[in-house]
């Protein structure tokens, strides 16, 4: 049972103890030992990213029948203009702050300041619904601007920390894909966030060839999707090259929240089935 309307029960993600076969092949005895020892009731959820062609209300209605944790992509058709929409639902929400048209590392101070304002506005909504927030770490347009962009990011980081502290909001920076101008692409880049919360995007890490190293870090949230290691397709689990057995082991180790973040609702359903084949059930 999903979170549903107010009064409905809560659903959680369970790791089974009778795993035998994984889609990418037979699990090694070590993989079997790790996953079979995972504790049950590990919570997972779904991002509204799969339903961006629908209204936010319709997306919440459909996803709340499946899960008790929903990450809302707070832009486009799912931009939250009024937090009262969430009063019709129980369960837990996470907000993915707007990312198109904003850059908290912009060399242009006016753009940086406006981008921070967009983030803090998202924090204000998060306070109303008790949600954590995921943020993109910004980018630079030219290699010659990289140091300036780092300085701008550090200024934004301090302002965001102050705003989050004032509102008692937890936020995470997400690792980016394989385009060179993005901040935070590899574990070596984690220093830039200076101990602030980290959201591990599994697909993005795979694109940069550093997923195993990222799985050894500390993170508080995770985006689950698959790809072939070349394109950021946000494909259903099992359609790409990612081995999700160690991913689930890292989730168990950290106790992080996680959401499926694929492009289509059918992809969500396929991902649930694929995760079920390695002992995960909603």
Regions found by a protein language model. Name each.
Residues 15-17, 21-121, 282:
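N-terminal pre-domain/capping segments
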Residues 24, 30-45, 58-61, 132, ...:
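Histidine-acidic metal/acid-base catalytic patches
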Residues 33, 37, 105-197, 253:
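Active-site acidic/histidine proton-transfer and metal-coordination neighborhood
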Residues 50-57, 69-84, 103-105, 109-110, ...:
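Acidic-and-aromatic substrate-binding clefts and catalytic sites of carbohydrate-active enzymes
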Residues 60-65, 79-97, 121-129, 161-166, ...:
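Acidic (Asp/Glu)-rich catalytic clusters
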Residues 96-100, 132-140, 225-227:
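Short loop/turn segments at strand-loop or loop-helix junctions that form parts
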């Amino acid at each position: 049972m999903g979170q549903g309307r107010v009064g409905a029960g809560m659903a959680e993600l369970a790791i089974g103890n009778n795993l035998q076969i994984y889609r990418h092949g037979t699990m090694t005895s070590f993989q079997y030992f790790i996953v079979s020892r995972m504790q049950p009731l590990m919570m997972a959820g779904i991002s509204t990213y799969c339903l961006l062609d629908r209204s936010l209300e319709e997306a919440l209605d459909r996803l709340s029948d499946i899960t008790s944790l929903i990450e809302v992509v707070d832009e486009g058709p799912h931009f939250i203009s009024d937090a009262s929409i969430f009063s019709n639902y129980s369960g837990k929400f996470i907000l993915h702050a707007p990312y198109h048209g904003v850059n908290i590392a912009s060399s242009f101070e006016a753009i940086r300041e406006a981008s921070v304002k967009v983030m803090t506005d998202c924090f204000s909504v998060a306070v109303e619904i008790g949600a954590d927030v995921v943020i993109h770490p910004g980018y630079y347009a030219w290699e010659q601007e990289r140091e300036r962009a780092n300085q701008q990011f550090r200024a934004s980081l301090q302002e965001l920390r102050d705003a989050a502290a004032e509102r008692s909001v937890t936020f995470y920076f997400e690792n980016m894909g394989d385009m060179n101008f993005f901040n935070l692409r590899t574990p070596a880049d984690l220093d830039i966030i200076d101990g602030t919360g980290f959201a591990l995007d599994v697909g993005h890490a795979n694109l940069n060839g550093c997923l195993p190293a990222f799985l050894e870090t500390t993170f508080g949230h995770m985006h689950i999707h698959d790809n072939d290691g070349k394109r950021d397709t946000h494909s259903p689990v099992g359609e790409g090259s990612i081995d999700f057995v160690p991913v689930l082991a890292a989730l168990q180790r950290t106790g992080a929240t996680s959401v499926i973040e694929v492009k289509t609702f059918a992809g969500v359903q396929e991902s649930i089935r694929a995760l079920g084949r390695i002992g995960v059930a909603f």
